[in-house]
Amino acid sequence: MSLSLHLSGWPENSESRQRMLESSSSTNFVQHFVSREISNKERLLSLFRRLRNGLVLVLTPLFFGQMLNWEGPEWKCAYCVCIIAVYWMSEVMPLAVTAMLPVVLFPLVGVLDANTTAKEYMNDTNFLFIGGLIMAAAVEKCDLHERVALSVLRCVGSEPKWIMLGFMTVTALLSSFISNTATTAMMVPIGQSVVQQLISSFQHHPTNGERGRLGCKKMATGLVLSICFAANIGGTGTATGTPSNLVMLGQLSALFPKVDGSLNYVTWIFFAYPLMLLCLFVAWMTLVSFFLRDAPEKDEAVTEMLKTRYNELPRMTYAEKSVFVCFCILLSLWVFRNPGVVPGFGVFFKKGAYTDATSAMIVAFLLFVLPSERPDLATYIKKEDLKKRGCLMDWKTMQETFPWSVVLLLGGGFALAAGVKESGLSLLIGNSLSSIEHLPLWILQLLTMLIAMVITNICSNTVTASIFVPIVATLAQRAGHHPFTLMLPTTLASSFAFIFPVGTPPNAIVFGSGMVKVSDMAFVGGIISLELLVLTVLYMNSIAYLTLPLLEFPTWAIIANSTMQQ
């Protein structure tokens, strides 16, 4: 925040700001009047929000209530879906609380029984998510992610455009495996330090004029924007990178029970990582053209500062080494369970007995067992030393850092998908989309991605994927296209929330730094969104065919379709 105040000419020192405000009695009067007016506005806005929330909560079930009188279970399911979708998008209640409504609504209206609905909240995909988050929490606990970030950034040079590329690369890499929010929260302070160093060096050159000052301000904006954009893009790279990816995998199993293993952790990386890197490059080029045209020249002091920060890190601890080994073990288990090219170790188990969630939970269990300090038999004998020793992960850290609300949100999405399938609502939606099913595939991809991209900027990507993935799966099925051809781009588009600060937590963190205006984020974010939309459609109709079997309509989708039609 102090950096933005400095750039705008506002005194950084609180005493200086106070003297400026108290320079005259009229200033005090105006300040008091304005603060009173602002407080009145805040009270009115708060009252309006409470009234609006109450009206939405009460009127939404009444507005859609006529659906309950229509014949067929699909309309009862549609009634529940409409209520949940409105509550999610308006956020009249916490998202996780709304996600629990299927447990109440589905049994009451006769869509699913309570036991079947509740099972969806702790299915295999949700345990995969839980295991991945425990691994990420262990990485954050020992600060391994900071060491990785600084070790890469100190090698990128001192020119602003390469610094930006370094930040985006590190952020995308980390957000592929740990929380996008945690990655952004760690990278923004580092980015602010780098920008402060560049501006400090710029001020030592008195020949730089107003244009150079504005260039510094734009550079600061562009650099922190690149962090949140890279975090959103990086989450698409792996199946566990962001919750919306897991929503798609979970709903794939719910909508198509006989689906094969063609889309797993390994094949997702082969499919999505090249696209993620292409999207990252396009976003970087766009940010450079908008924010770094008048940036200061390269400054070796920045490189030295990053090297100094890296050298100030303590030696790699036993905990960091152990967590890194556990991380490698987890990746190896995910990769070699079913690599696709050759049979994996999964062939030694019955079908469904060992999944990616099994690997995640095995490593999560190890993190709670392995010590955080090097074992020493002599000290273990002493009881007082034994009490001081901890493990790589502990339950207190879990309670403080684990996003339980996201687990419920995922479960709510899976319950919705199960209800949509069992009630026949997916078939009803497919029939209603018959007018556009004959359009070329690339146009369908553009339309579905555009809708998902608009919605994800006003509500979470998990909610967006939960609502739209079943719809586009049915549309692809009716149009005779492989379901992946619409499900995958729609899922990816749900992560392309670059326009508003409320779109994703990384956006909100960057906006909270005080270095970004809403207009800056909205303008360049809108352009990048359209660029990535076109790039994804081109990728889906070219390179994607080399990574996934998308050319032929799968037998598991034909069987599901024929069953539904009967």
From Swiss-Prot:
Gene Ontology molecular function, alphabetical: citrate transmembrane transporter activity; high-affinity sodium:dicarboxylate symporter activity; succinate transmembrane transporter activity
Record keywords, A-Z: Ion transport, Membrane, Sodium, Sodium transport, Symport, Transmembrane, Transmembrane helix, Transport
Organism: Caenorhabditis elegans
Annotated PROSITE patterns: NA_SULFATE
GO cellular component, one term: plasma membrane
Residues annotated as transmembrane: 55-75, 92-112, 123-139, 162-182, 219-239, 268-288, 329-349, 352-372, 400-420, 439-459, 496-516, 521-541
Its membrane topology: Multi-pass membrane protein
Source species taxonomy: Eukaryota, Metazoa, Ecdysozoa, Nematoda, Chromadorea
Role: High-affinity sodium-dicarboxylate cotransporter that accepts a range of tricarboxylic acid-cycle intermediates with 4-5 carbon atoms. There is no interaction with monocarboxylates. Plays a role in the regulation of life span.
Major location (coarse): membrane
Pfam family, one: Na_sulph_symp
Record's subcellular location: Membrane
Gene expressing this chain: nac-3
Tissue expression summary: Nad-1 and nad-2 are coexpressed in the intestinal tract from early larvae to adults, expression is from the pharynx through to the anus. Expression level is significantly greater in the anterior half of the intestine than in the posterior half.
Similarity field: Belongs to the SLC13A/DASS transporter (TC 2.A.47) family. NADC subfamily.
Protein name per UniProt: Sodium-dependent high-affinity dicarboxylate transporter 3
Single GO BP term: succinate transport
